[in-house]
Amino acid sequence: LSLSEEDALKAQIFGCWSIPLGLPYNENLLVRIKLKLKPDGSVIKSEILDHARMNKPGQGFYKVLAESALRAIQLCQPLRVPTTGYDRWKDLQLNFDAREMLEG
């Protein structure tokens, strides 16, 4: 995806994302998600790339944050994807930074 296409996709998902309250701002609030998409923008698979972090001590907030990002992807289906170039965007990695969204 081009940068503008990726930004548009993230903006769509951000619109569906209810970020949990009470996040520790001094922590890394980045969630990396790998997506596999159908040509119509439906999600075949979504996977948290930092899955091991979800079960580390003191990272309970990350599990809640990551699960909320996955829910946003499910709620926003089908994603608005380009009508051409399926091979370029059928497998994507998107970075969701809660701090970026909260700070505007």
Write out the residue ranges for each language-model feature.
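Conserved "boundary/linchpin" sites in short secondary-structure elements
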Residues: 11-18, 34-55, 70-104
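Intrinsic-disorder/low-complexity signature in envelope-associated proteins
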Residues: 1-18, 22-23
